[in-house]
């Protein structure tokens, strides 16, 4: 387990917590003075009230919460959102309402999850061509939609 420095930039902030013993992501709560109404097909930048100092070689990703997505069509349009190790500002979450009804976000509502992971930096080696594979340039649905067996009609 790594240690990550965290600072409350708002004394009312709820710090991120793991909801269960084996959760990969920590719940991130809204830190608001008053509720924010998220109208259908609109976005809002929601403060968390905290800032973090990640060690070099790590990132944090903000991801949607499955319950908000399933029940209210609330998500993060830039998911996963990346927090770099050298960022020192308040963690804020962009929420989008894909639903048909307004959605109210209140102080303390768990609005996202945060996963901290190692990242590798790369040094690109420019070449004239790439090696051949069976897949080649296939992408964007080229394998079809059937999970196990080809469909029979």
Swiss-Prot record:
Protein residues bound to substrate: 65-67, 78, 82-84
Gene3D superfamilies reported in the protein's UniProt record: 2.70.40.10
Biochemical pathway: Pyrimidine metabolism; dUMP biosynthesis; dUMP from dCTP (dUTP route): step 2/2
Bilayer-crossing regions: none
Keyword Oxidoreductase included in the entry's annotation: no
Region (Disordered): 132-153
Entries under SUPFAM superfamilies matching the protein: dUTPase-like
Top class in the EC scheme: hydrolase
GO MF terms held by the record: dUTP diphosphatase activity; magnesium ion binding
Cofactor field: Mg(2+)
EC number: 3.6.1.23
CDD domains referenced in this protein's UniProt entry, alphabetically: trimeric_dUTPase
Catalysed reaction equations from the record: dUTP + H2O = dUMP + diphosphate + H(+)
Keywords: Hydrolase, Magnesium, Metal-binding, Nucleotide metabolism
Biological-process GO terms, alphabetical: dUMP biosynthetic process; dUTP catabolic process
Family designation: Belongs to the dUTPase family.
Protein function: This enzyme is involved in nucleotide metabolism: it produces dUMP, the immediate precursor of thymidine nucleotides and it decreases the intracellular concentration of dUTP so that uracil cannot be incorporated into DNA.
Protein name in UniProt: Deoxyuridine 5'-triphosphate nucleotidohydrolase
